[in-house]
Design a protein with these regions (language model features):
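Interfacial helix-cap and linker-helix signal at transmembrane-aqueous boundaries
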Residues: 60-61, 99-100, 104, 192-201
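Extracytoplasmic gate region of multi-pass secondary transporters
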Residues: 30-97, 152-160, 164, 189
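Juxtamembrane intracellular "pre-TM" segments in multi-pass secondary transporters
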Residues: 2-38, 70-75
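Conserved glycine-rich helix-kink/hinge and helix-boundary motifs of the Major Facilitator Superfamily
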Residues: 39, 79, 83, 119, ...
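A late C-terminal transmembrane helix in Major Facilitator Superfamily
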Residues: 93, 167-200
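C-terminal transmembrane helical hairpin of 12-TM major facilitator-type secondary transporters
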Residues: 111-158
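A membrane-interface helix-boundary motif in multi-pass transporters
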Residues: 75, 113-116, 194-207
């Protein structure tokens, strides 16, 4: 069936207007301190994340004399020590966004919520990482790893979505740029961690 003139007119009138994609103001981005903070936060978060992804199994399996947990790779305990923190990480990432939204709906300003969840997330992670370095109980280490992942998940409601607050029209580009900076940490952190382990044979320095 062919469209009638009235239908064609309706389609043209209701069609979304064409807007040219705005150019990215790179110079302004470099000078924009909030965006620089997002990029730094992404870099730091990825540094710890990819260090754990790369070396957590090795840490759990490493002999106690070398600062590891001494858990056999084929044991169920090893799977437990690796799996539980990962599950907690997934759940906390989802809940972190809901937490930030809930605080904003309660009347807290967006900027205070973003700063608050970032502060809790990063300072909390730093504290629990420090505690792991002196812990020799597997259960306590797993609990601390879970708490670290909870703190990292809380940050999902902070720098993880802050791009949309700074420039709604440039959200995709901002995420791409900060994500690219974060991937530099993803490349470097396993290399640095491996080098430090080879030189010092100490896990406490890694944490």
């Amino acid at each position: 069936k062919n469209l009638s003139p009235q239908e064609l007119k309706l389609i043209k009138n209701e069609a979304p207007s064409k807007e040219s994609a705005p150019s990215i103001p790179f110079l302004k981005l470099i000078k924009n301190m909030p965006f620089v903070a997002i990029a730094v936060a992404t870099f730091c978060n990825n540094w710890s994340l990819y260090t754990f992804l790369s070396y957590l199994p090795k840490y759990v399996n490493a002999p106690i004399t070398e600062g590891g947990m001494g858990i056999d790779l084929s044991s169920n305990i090893f799977v437990f020590a690796i799996l539980i923190p990962c599950v907690v990480s997934i759940v906390s990432l989802i809940m972190g966004g809901y937490l930030a939204d809930a605080l904003i709906k309660k009347g807290y300003s967006v900027i205070n919520v973003r700063k608050g969840v970032n502060s809790v997330g990063f300072f909390g992670s730093a504290l629990f990482l420090f505690l792991i370095s002196s812990e020799d109980s597997l259960l306590n280490v797993v609990i601390l790893l879970c708490l670290i992942n909870v703190c990292s998940g809380i940050c999902a409601g902070g720098f993880g979505v802050n791009h949309a607050d700074l420039g709604p029209k440039y959200t995709g580009s901002l995420v791409g740029i900060s994500g690219s900076i974060g991937m530099i940490a993803a490349i470097l952190s396993p290399i640095v961690a491996g080098t430090v382990l080879q030189i010092t044979n100490s896990w406490s320095i890694i944490f």
